[in-house]
């Protein structure tokens, strides 16, 4: 959903910004005995996932994806206290910042949980995150001469398995762009020695793109963006009162898929805020953005009865015949009472979402 602009008449003001750069004292880095660090900082493994499908679209349903990334990276083993003699093992620890939900699953978003397994060459080849002190038995010739030794061609963290679990049925799919999953740490030690890991991971796993889909989908406005272009508007709250410049659209809705063959299926809709968020002065309105301050300007949405549709809250579009019909919605710019809005363009972005209830 795209809501645009246009010019609000007022004076423009040029701003000049200045800053001060200060020199901070340098601090020596203290490495732990046996700690492994990646040269140049943690290696980021970017996983691009194909479409992952839940054919039944039922809560608790599982889908498994294997990943194997070709990246290798170089690191350094630190031994500031004493030499680590050859035939030591490399041990790994992995953690995640996602909230736990039990049975080794973590909540990825409101629709999907995830279980993460990294592949390690050792007695436990596919440990589940989180884990600690898992040895890699592939290389038993690792050692370290004071104060450090190179550790080339590391691939740990590059392969494994992701298990997705539906929290609830979804419509149209869920995007996983930019999802940070887990991080891995390493250290070199002999089997009987204590294991301590540094604060910096050697690698991180991030999903750069991926879509989880089902056979159930709703198509809005025949697949085209819903756009409201207000043209030139006034610049005071007297003009920007949520009624002037109002635009009304009649949006076609078509829902199809296995779940929609059940006449008892109940769906609700939600206008989910995008980068412009909600209006700072009233959470019932969409926020706006622009090249100048837009904190006092919002967009109000109303249904055909004139009732306000607050963003990020579920609502009904009325009766749909076999889950097909139309949604009448109006949009209008609204300013904070008593405010004067600076000249320039403005826009708001949001997404219309359907969900089973």
From Swiss-Prot:
What does UniProt give as the signal peptide span?
Answer: 1-28
Task: Indicate where this protein resides in the cell.
Answer: Fimbrium
- Choose any GO biological process term that the UniProt entry carries and state it: cell adhesion involved in single-species biofilm formation
Source species, please?
A: Proteus mirabilis (strain HI4320)
Q: Which SUPFAM superfamilies match?
A: Bacterial adhesins
Q: Which GO terms describe its cellular component?
A: pilus
Gene name for this UniProt entry: pmfE
Keyword annotations from UniProtKB, A to Z = Fimbrium, Signal
For this entry, the protein name equals: Putative minor fimbrial subunit PmfE
């Amino acid at each position: 959903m795209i809501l645009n602009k246009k010019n609000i008449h007022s004076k423009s003001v040029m701003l000049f910004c200045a800053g001060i750069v200060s020199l901070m004292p340098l601090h020596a880095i203290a490495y732990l005995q046996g700690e492994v660090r990646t040269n140049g900082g943690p290696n980021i493994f970017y996983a691009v996932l194909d479409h992952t499908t839940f054919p039944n679209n039922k809560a608790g349903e599982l889908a498994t994806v294997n990943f194997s990334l070709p990246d290798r990276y170089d690191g350094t083993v630190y031994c500031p206290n004493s030499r680590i003699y050859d035939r030591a093992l490399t041990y790994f620890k992995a953690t995640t910042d996602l909230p736990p939900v039990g049975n080794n699953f973590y909540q990825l978003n409101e629709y999907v949980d995830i279980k993460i397994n990294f592949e390690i060459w050792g007695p436990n080849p596919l440990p589940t995150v989180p884990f600690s002190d898992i040895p890699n038995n592939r290389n038993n010739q690792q050692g370290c001469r004071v104060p450090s030794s190179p550790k080339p061609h590391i691939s740990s963290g590059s392969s494994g398995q992701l298990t997705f679990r539906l929290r609830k049925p979804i419509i149209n799919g869920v995007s996983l762009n930019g999802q940070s999953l887990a991080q891995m740490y390493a250290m070199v030690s002999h089997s009987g020695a204590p294991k301590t890991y540094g604060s910096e991971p050697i690698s991180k796993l991030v999903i750069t793109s991926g879509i989880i889909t089902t056979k159930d989908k709703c198509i809005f406005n025949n697949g085209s963006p819903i756009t409201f272009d207000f043209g030139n508007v006034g610049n005071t709250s007297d003009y920007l009162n949520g009624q002037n410049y109002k635009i009304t659209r009649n949006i076609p809705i078509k829902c199809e898929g296995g779940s929609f063959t059940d006449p008892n299926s109940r769906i609700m809709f939600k206008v989910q805020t995008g980068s412009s968020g909600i209006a700072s002065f009233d959470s019932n309105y969409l926020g706006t953005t622009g090249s100048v301050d837009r904190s006092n300007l919002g967009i109000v949405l109303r249904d055909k009865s004139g009732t306000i549709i607050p963003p990020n809250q579920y609502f009904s579009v009325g009766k749909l015949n076999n889950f097909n019909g139309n949604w009448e919605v109006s949009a209008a710019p609204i300013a904070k009472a008593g405010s004067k809005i600076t000249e320039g363009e403005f826009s708001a972005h949001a997404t219309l979402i359907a969900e089973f209830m």
